[in-house]
Amino acid sequence: LEDMELMTWAIFQSGQKIPAKIYSKILAQWDQYSHQMANFHETYDILLTPTVADVAPKHGQFALSENLQNQLKHMADFDWPKQQELIWEMFADSLDWTPFTQQANLTGQPSISLPVYRDEQGLSLGVQLTAAKGREDLLLHLTQQMEECSVFS
């Protein structure tokens, strides 16, 4: 635990106890999501979404409670269902704020987040561009075009 961030360590511990049947099912679901996105990209070059659902959060807004941190430190002592409950609790508050970014993490697609607007307080709002697997070149080319048009704020 000294050489690993607490949330990463907790996820690692949960992975040690995941039943093989469930692990296989999860991998199959990830493959299905990847296939669906590959089909999407046969028609569309880019998926455009907001990066997040709002402006930047306040510092510490999604900080883990002391109680949750203590439970995570003892993650190895819990059975797998309890571990899953704690992992969900780790992310639950922030998922409403970042509903769009997980997809690329699950499917392995290249994505880029770009600041395209500033609100009245100067906080950036961004868009996320997601391309098909292996099409990082498309993201870089589009980003260059946007930069040349002074789109970034």
Provide a role label for each language-model segment.
Residues 1-38, 54-83, 115-116, 120-123:
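Short helix-loop capping/hinge segments that flank enzyme active sites or metal/cofactor-binding pockets
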Residues 72-102:
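Aromatic-anchored helix/helix-loop segment that forms the rim or "lid"
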Residues 18, 24, 90-100, 105-153:
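Structural helix-boundary/capping segments
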